[in-house]
Amino acid sequence: MKKLLITLLIVASIVACGSQQSQKRDSLQRVVVEPAQYGYVVKNVYPHSTKSYTQGLQFVNGVLWEGTGEWGKSVLQKVDLESGKCEVLARLPKSEFGEGITVLGDKVYQLTWTNNVAHVYDLKGKLIKNERYSGEGWGLTTDGKMLYMSDGSTYIYKVNPETFKREGKITVTLRGHAIEYINELEWIEGKIWANVYTTHEILIINPETGVVEGVVSFANLLKEEDTTADTDVFNGIAYDKEQKRIFVTGKNWNKLYEVEIIKR
């Protein structure tokens, strides 16, 4: 899915960010900040279903929620952390490609890629309603009040959870340059953590300004011996705010990792 072209474009974008020393001022008056650089240490490893094309991941009240993609295979499910066993709560229509999810209060929200519809469920997976939106749906998270949504562009939109209307947006910038292909999102300690599609990097973003304040590299997380022909890109961020645990995985990966972030 759109992977090769996007990878080439992302590489070009990141190279430009690293090599240019200055840029002309634009109408956004972007703030140039040198982001902190982080690596990781694996704390625990858990099984993950290789049938789960992970699009969204969230850990809430001891429950790991996962939304998966692919035409005809997209689901909303709960995952037992220790065993990796999946309990499918809802299956999307075969005409829909599932994307990001988030849990807010007693509702679960799930985006679709190109169908312009978000499904809203109760905590048992019963469909409550559908909400329409323009453009593509990619990542979704919440600060506990509002939703934050990505569409693969440089923007993250602030969305009203009751009406699904956009009430604002930020442009994600790295060293003053707008970064595209913002994908899976997670709200962690007042910041938006976002995967850049097809890369092993997560950006730590100021939700007010869009400025990238940190970059976490997850290079070499999945070992070659753990890959198969179906193994796809790094994707999926979840945060257990009670125990301060961070979980990451990828599409059709056989492992889900609990990681500690280490500043370089």
Task: Give the predicted meaning of each segment.
Residues 79-84, 122-126, 160-164, 206-210, ...:
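Short loop/turn segments that connect beta-strands within beta-propeller blades
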Residues 43-75, 90-102, 138-139, 250-256:
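Beta-strand-rich domains and repeat architectures in extracellular enzymes and scaffolds
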Residues 30-51, 81-87:
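A short helix->beta-strand "capping" segment at the edge of beta-propeller domains
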Residues 13-16:
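C-terminal motif of bacterial Sec signal peptides marking the signal peptidase cleavage site
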Residues 50-60, 94-104, 133-144, 150, ...:
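Beta-rich, blade/repeat-based domains predominating
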Residues 66-70, 108-115, 149-153, 194-198, ...:
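Conserved beta-strand positions in repeat-built beta-propeller and related beta-rich domains
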